């Protein structure tokens, strides 16, 4: 089977795009390797896991925890289960640093996205990944 590289930023990646893809690739028998800027596990966009902050009133400190629309917009239950399983996987817990990645070592590349520029910017603008 193929060896697939999934580079992710330190934070704010979309948990559904990463975890569901990871789950499908593993289920199909592929080997998955993660890579992050410094070789430490990344953190998904918490807003997409909890739904907090996705409602119209999400910017109001006292109301942030009240989710209505946010519950519909967050990652669904299956994606959250896949994310929880991915967090326990050795490949996710011990990623390569981006500078350690060698193109010849991999058969495929998956570039997942995210919603918030604050964490995704380093990933999108990385000269190493380009």
Regions found by a protein language model. Give the residues of each.
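Extended, subdomain-level signal for the structured scaffold at the beginning of enzyme domains
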Residues: 1-130
């Amino acid at each position: 089977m193929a060896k697939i590289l999934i580079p992710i930023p330190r934070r704010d990646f979309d948990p559904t795009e990463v975890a569901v893809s990871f789950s499908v690739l593993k289920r199909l028998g592929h080997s998955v390797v993660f890579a992050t800027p410094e070789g430490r596990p990344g953190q998904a966009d918490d807003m997409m896991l909890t739904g907090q902050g996705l409602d119209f009133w999400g910017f109001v400190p006292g109301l942030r925890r009240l989710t209505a629309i946010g519950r519909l917009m967050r990652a669904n239950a299956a994606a959250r289960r896949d994310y929880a399983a991915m967090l326990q996987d050795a490949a996710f817990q011990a990623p390569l640093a981006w500078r350690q990645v060698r193109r010849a070592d991999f058969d495929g590349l998956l570039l997942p996205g995210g919603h918030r520029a604050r964490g995704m910017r380093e990933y999108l603008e990385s000269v190493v990944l380009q």
